[in-house]
Amino acid sequence: MATTTPERVMQETMDYHALNAMLNLYDKAGHIQFDKDQQAIDAFFATHVRPHSVTFASQHERLGTLVREGYYDDAVLARYDRAFVLRLFEHAHASGFRFQTFLGAWKFYTSYTLKTFDGKRYLEHFEDRVTMVALTLAQGDETLATQLTDEMLSGRFQPATPTFLNCGKQQRGELVSCFLLRIEDNMESIGRAVNSALQLSKRGGGVAFLLSNLREAGAPIKRIENQSSGVIPVMKMLEDAFSYANQLGARQGAGAVYLHAHHPDILRFLDTKRENADEKIRIKTLSLGVVIPDITFRLAKENAQMALFSPYDIQRRYGKPFGDIAISERYDELIADPHVRKTYINARDFFQTLAEIQFESGYPYIMFEDTVNRANPIAGRINMSNLCSEILQVNSASRYDDNLDYTHIGHDISCNLGSLNIAHVMDSPDIGRTVETAIRGLTAVSDMSHIRSVPSIAAGNAASHAIGLGQMNLHGYLAREGIAYGSPEALDFTNLYFYTITWHAVHTSMRLARERGKTFAGFAQSRYASGDYFTQYLQDDWQPKTAKVRALFARSGITLPTREMWLKLRDDVMRYGIYNQNLQAVPPTGSISYINHATSSIHPIVAKIEIRKEGKTGRVYYPAPFMTNENLDMYQDAYDIGPEKIIDTYAEATRHVDQGLSLTLFFPDTATTRDINKAQIYAWRKGIKSLYYIRLRQLALEGTEIEGCVSCAL
């Protein structure tokens, strides 16, 4: 007769959340209870998913019903032979896919899967969602649809949240992740900006605005002195717009604003995030970013005064908006110009204030203006970033008449994101096909996006075909291979991995241009067209420096691009062009990295067992990928690793990424503002393009989070 132990009785009566919570409790031997998380997955499916899933007699009946009742978009399915569609669904369900963690399964079923209109029952499993995404993005191409299905089911490629959530649904938001818009120094542009915030937020995107062009507080209006209210009232209007707009009630809109460090309102701008700020100026939900040029660091090094220049005067004097001026290059000229009003603050005091605000709020983000523009291969100027600080693209101004109609449609920015899982890519049978499939999938998102409510976004997307291929699971992969994050081997791998991805990404974009007979607008003026983009790859030696990394690529069967391959690619690009103005950007990957069982982006883990605060559900626990009780020493967390090794890692990747990378800096609870400033200076010297949040270890607050942009966080 079988005996029943107290432990077995307890496990059989525990629900899936209780089982998942046991990840955070050691067993009697002092080990992490990874098996309890696997039991939580089984319990979740047995007691929740299956009882709440709608069943159908066949896939054919399921598709017919979902189209007829308004769940699936028949236009997507109609582009294929129905027999192929049924085979692809069967192929997906035969893949043997299984969620690796409870949080991954829970995230998918609460946030991504198609539900009945009352929200109570599930109409999809993971394989179904993947297949609908693949069918949508392949646009009738059976081969591409199959490849996308395989890449997603294997975990090698994952589209960002808006794409993965909305593809194939009849009632959906846009497939696009994020938007960046300029605001010019006139009421028409400001009014358009508020409307754009409403329209884009309603469609599920994160939206960033450039404020640098707006005249400062006290500037003239129609030549009458001391009339302008400056940037803060505009920030207030935008914050209210984002609070009002949300995607089908799913989440509050998310917005960011960027201001140049040499704008006269910069200190008022930073003060809006102080904990004790007056309610009249306090900004609670809008994210802040500061654009800092090289000259600011030089002035701080010299302990000199830094000049803040009037955007109103710059526009009148030079015929250009403030954001289109290279302040470092023209600093002395602007100082000497008596027609440009200027005020002065101490440069070191500015950095001290910056660190104080970051200490209190985690903001602002930082974009290193001159570093970004030196690395930019596209003609034009980059003067802002996005809600997650990884999108870096050129823009151009729009003009309006008194009716707010466009007299000239400029180019604003949208970016279509998706990420590769580094561990699975290194296991890919064909890394070239993996990257090509991802680039083609993301390009489809761009091709299918037409944001008519904001014509400057539509025009920018139509001209640029810009995408952002990201990466995740770097720490997970390194740990799996016995490599410490930030070690010489880790830096060597990061450099050569991104080097290899870059060749395949550019090669795919060249093939797209050759197939379609079309490049992005402005290709002829780019460093791709001149061949200058390829100089670093033709001059430097791109081979592993460590035996460990050489062995990793050899084991994976990956051929590192040779100088001859780069020469051939350069010649092909100069002949055919490339289709995508921008190709890579590394976002902070949130929800999707849990579904993929990946470490977030390319930064280290924040804890061996991460504690997530998930709305009304409470705490959910997530074990780091590939972690066992035998390799825990490979999983040092970001706070212990410290900012320098993280910056070193990002610097290796930055050499190859044409846009930016979301880089969060982590500090122990003993950190000071001086530590933050030292890390910022180190990042600038290492060629980092932008900095995302500042995070201080606060043990009392573990399991809480500051919500950023769900779109960009994937």
Curated annotation (Swiss-Prot):
Q: Which residues form the signal peptide?
A: none
Alphabetically sorted, this entry's keywords are:
Allosteric enzyme, ATP-binding, Deoxyribonucleotide synthesis, Disulfide bond, Nucleotide-binding, Oxidoreductase
MF terms per GO, please?
Answer: ATP binding; ribonucleoside-diphosphate reductase activity, thioredoxin disulfide as acceptor
Site residues by UniProt (Important for hydrogen atom transfer): C178, C415
Binding positions for substrate per the UniProt entry: T161, S177, C178, G206, N386, L387, C388, S389, E390, P588, T589, G590, S591, I592
Q: What is the regulation of this protein's activity?
A: Under complex allosteric control mediated by deoxynucleoside triphosphates and ATP binding. The type of nucleotide bound at the specificity site determines substrate preference. It seems probable that ATP makes the enzyme reduce CDP and UDP, dGTP favors ADP reduction and dTTP favors GDP reduction. Lacks the N-terminal activity site.
Which Cys pairs does UniProt list as disulfide-bonded?
C178-C415
- First-tier enzyme category under EC: oxidoreductase
Q: Where is this site: Allosteric effector binding?
A: D185, R215, K222
Q: Where is this site: Interacts with thioredoxin/glutaredoxin?
A: C709, C712
Marked site: Important for electron transfer: Y692, Y693
Per the Swiss-Prot or TrEMBL record, the active site comprises N386 (proton acceptor), C388 (cysteine radical intermediate), E390 (proton acceptor)
Taken from the UniProt entry, a GO cellular component term is: ribonucleoside-diphosphate reductase complex
**Which PROSITE patterns does its entry note?**
RIBORED_LARGE
GO annotations under biological process? deoxyribonucleotide biosynthetic process
Q: What is its EC number?
A: 1.17.4.1
Q: Which reaction does it catalyse?
A: a 2'-deoxyribonucleoside 5'-diphosphate + [thioredoxin]-disulfide + H2O = a ribonucleoside 5'-diphosphate + [thioredoxin]-dithiol
Protein family: Belongs to the ribonucleoside diphosphate reductase large chain family.
Q: What does this protein do?
A: Provides the precursors necessary for DNA synthesis. Catalyzes the biosynthesis of deoxyribonucleotides from the corresponding ribonucleotides. R1E contains the binding sites for both substrates and allosteric effectors and carries out the actual reduction of the ribonucleotide.
Q: Which NCBIfam families match?
A: NrdE_NrdA, RNR_1b_NrdE
Tell me how this protein assembles: Tetramer of two alpha and two beta subunits.
Record-given protein name? Ribonucleoside-diphosphate reductase 2 subunit alpha
Name of encoding gene: nrdE
